[in-house]
Amino acid sequence: MKRFCSLLLALTLILSLGACGGSPATPETTQSSAPESVSAPEPSSPPAENASSEAALEKTGKTLRVAALKGPTAMGMVKLMEDAARGETANGYQFTLAGSPDEIVGSIVKGEFDIAAVPTNLAATLYHKTQGKVQLVALNTLGVLYVVEAGDTIQSVSDLAGKTIYSTGKGSTPEFALNYILEKNGLADSVSVEYKTEHAELAALLSQGQAELALLPQPFVTTALAQNDKLRVALDLTQEWDKAAQGASQLTMGCIVAQTSFLEENPAAAAAFLAEYEASVAFVTDPANLDAAAALVVQAGILPKEPVAKAALPHCAITFVAGEEMKKTASGFLEVLYNADPKAVGGALPDDGLYYTG
């Protein structure tokens, strides 16, 4: 009932709005750089007349500062970004796209973002680090990790023994998920892992033949495969996680966090965001919208070409899970990580205060 009321409120606000233009995001490079701040990508068609950016602000009185990572977390937001550019949202929005979590963690801790899309384990770490000033509000990405190989020697996890895997995500979900699977398979001491800063950097190394074995998330798996026909997906870490966890948890890669003060002081804006973001995810994940969603992903600078975006989107495990279901799923995942390595969740299993259920 709460979600229905929130959605009804957001829809009522949205229907009274006009439209406005925005600025396109800069395409991602393979080098680590400062995160990009953009109002929103340009709308894909001309906005309606008699519109202004102030129209949205008159409804909630709030411009939300939103950060996301260049990958599935941002891909689920692209329709919201376009709607914001048209002025068709209840909130004003300023989006920041980053290449890695390290680029935005400091700003989240300082309260410089109202909302951010981050790895799920990082939500727990931020909750501890800020003494409860950051809360988990929704899950947005399930399992998207794959081991990609230049060859055909890896047929099972046991084949990783004695190998070196290149990966990204040190200190976040990819590292701890891989470590958990290796530990459960008795390979913790027989596999070396070398970390790179950004997914795009690692995908480029694979494509150029400079790495033979890598752990990558979508959509960068699709990007690498499209650029080098000698590459193949060797292992799906979601399947390997399920085998290791034996039903105890679900691999949950990404989530939405928000400042506790923002949630408490701006309940209408928070409810409107959740409704607008859920609608964006529904649009992006609808097969009927694949062409349009791929165009928006490229328009936002997340991926360089529409064919790659179209190939990647169905495999990005983009989702929206909020409320009690979010709490149940996330808590099970974090408990598994904690039991495997307490530092994965900031040293202690978070209490129920982590979860914002509306």
At which residue positions do the language-model features occur?
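Sec-dependent N-terminal signal peptides of Gram-positive bacterial secreted proteins and lipoproteins
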Residues: R3-S23
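Bacterial lipoprotein signal-peptidase II cleavage site
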Residues: G18-T29, V38
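Short, glycine-/small- and polar/acidic-enriched structural segments
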Residues: A34-A40, P46-A188, V193-E194, E212-Q218, ...
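Pocket-lining segment of extracytoplasmic ligand-binding domains
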Residues: N121-L122, T130, E194, E198-L296
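Short, solvent-exposed loop/beta-turn-alpha elements that line the ligand-binding surface or hinge
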Residues: A84-N91, G162, Q239-S249, T319-K327
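Conserved C-terminal helix/tail region of periplasmic/extracytoplasmic solute-binding proteins
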Residues: S331-G358
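Secondary-structure end/capping motifs
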Residues: L263-A340
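A bilobed periplasmic-binding-protein/Venus flytrap-type ligand-binding module shared by bacterial periplasmic
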Residues: K79-M81, L145-S156, Q250-A268, T319
